Amino acid sequence: MLRAGAPTAGSFRTKEVHTGTTIMAVEFDGGVVVGSDSRVSAGEAVVNRVFDKLSPLHQRIFCALSGSAADAQAIADMAAYQLELHGLELEEPPLVLAAANVVKNISYKYREDLLAHLIVAGWDQREGGQVYGTMGGMLIRQPFTIGGSGSSYIYGYVDAAYKPGMTSEECRRFTTNAITLAMNRDGSSGGVIYLVTITVAGVDHRVILGDELPKFYDE
């Protein structure tokens, strides 16, 4: 028997599916690390526990998705299509800055219709590893950036823990710790952690399962 006020199967149909999220990207000398949690929710329901929020835009360029799952993926798909054409016209891979500008322009053009925030990160021969935030049509390069609902819980940690000149392994550890802390505090973040490391050598994908996440004293 359903109790009063309990969500029903039909009630979830009107709820927009959100990647209530923690996303992050960090530059290091020679590349970038991009990471995210994997929980997707619709209202009070978790509709996907292992959704990969790191979407490829080109060979060595990825974006991290947050906001409405459909809107964020639509922006990523449109950007990937434009960058594929851009690369064919130039006969060389597009620059990370070009990819970030494409995402920024799409986000701004459809700002009244789409609810999404994407972080663009990757490697190119001109500038090496780069991280760009694109919220609301803004474009800014940063040594690291965070986003999503879980990010509000970890600003203090990332500001204190970030050190210029970190290695790729230190950046992976930094990203893993930050996302784990956000998952512990934010009810909309959870699941596993996806990590992508992008360098001149290629793209390295890793998945950190729940029983492999770092432990903190407050757990």
From Swiss-Prot:
<dbReference type="GO" id="GO:0005829">
    <property type="term" value="C:cytosol"/>
</dbReference>
<keyword id="KW-0888">Threonine protease</keyword>
<dbReference type="GO" id="GO:0019774">
    <property type="term" value="C:proteasome core complex, beta-subunit complex"/>
</dbReference>
<feature type="propeptide" description="Removed in mature form">
    <location>
        <begin position="1"/>
        <end position="20"/>
    </location>
</feature>
<dbReference type="GO" id="GO:0002376">
    <property type="term" value="P:immune system process"/>
</dbReference>
<keyword id="KW-0645">Protease</keyword>
<keyword id="KW-0865">Zymogen</keyword>
<feature type="site" description="Cleavage; by autolysis">
    <location>
        <begin position="20"/>
        <end position="21"/>
    </location>
</feature>
<dbReference type="InterPro" id="IPR016050">
    <property type="entry name" value="Proteasome_bsu_CS"/>
</dbReference>
<dbReference type="Pfam" id="PF00227">
    <property type="entry name" value="Proteasome"/>
</dbReference>
<dbReference type="InterPro" id="IPR023333">
    <property type="entry name" value="Proteasome_suB-type"/>
</dbReference>
<keyword id="KW-0963">Cytoplasm</keyword>
<dbReference type="GO" id="GO:1990111">
    <property type="term" value="C:spermatoproteasome complex"/>
</dbReference>
<dbReference type="GO" id="GO:0004298">
    <property type="term" value="F:threonine-type endopeptidase activity"/>
</dbReference>
<dbReference type="InterPro" id="IPR000243">
    <property type="entry name" value="Pept_T1A_subB"/>
</dbReference>
<dbReference type="InterPro" id="IPR029055">
    <property type="entry name" value="Ntn_hydrolases_N"/>
</dbReference>
<keyword id="KW-0378">Hydrolase</keyword>
<comment type="subunit">
    <text>The 26S proteasome consists of a 20S proteasome core and two 19S regulatory subunits. The 20S proteasome core is composed of 28 subunits that are arranged in four stacked rings, resulting in a barrel-shaped structure. The two end rings are each formed by seven alpha subunits, and the two central rings are each formed by seven beta subunits. The catalytic chamber with the active sites is on the inside of the barrel. Component of the immunoproteasome, where it displaces the equivalent housekeeping subunit PSMB6.</text>
</comment>
<comment type="function">
    <text>The proteasome is a multicatalytic proteinase complex which is characterized by its ability to cleave peptides with Arg, Phe, Tyr, Leu, and Glu adjacent to the leaving group at neutral or slightly basic pH. The proteasome has an ATP-dependent proteolytic activity. This subunit is involved in antigen processing to generate class I binding peptides.</text>
</comment>
<dbReference type="GO" id="GO:0005839">
    <property type="term" value="C:proteasome core complex"/>
</dbReference>
<feature type="modified residue" description="N6-acetyllysine">
    <location>
        <position position="53"/>
    </location>
</feature>
<feature type="active site" description="Nucleophile">
    <location>
        <position position="21"/>
    </location>
</feature>
<keyword id="KW-0539">Nucleus</keyword>
<comment type="similarity">
    <text>Belongs to the peptidase T1B family.</text>
</comment>
<keyword id="KW-0391">Immunity</keyword>
<dbReference type="GO" id="GO:0051603">
    <property type="term" value="P:proteolysis involved in protein catabolic process"/>
</dbReference>
<dbReference type="InterPro" id="IPR001353">
    <property type="entry name" value="Proteasome_sua/b"/>
</dbReference>
<dbReference type="GO" id="GO:0005654">
    <property type="term" value="C:nucleoplasm"/>
</dbReference>
<keyword id="KW-0007">Acetylation</keyword>
<keyword id="KW-0647">Proteasome</keyword>
<protein>
    <recommendedName>
        <fullName>Proteasome subunit beta type-9</fullName>
        <ecNumber>3.4.25.1</ecNumber>
    </recommendedName>
</protein>
<feature type="modified residue" description="N6-acetyllysine">
    <location>
        <position position="109"/>
    </location>
</feature>
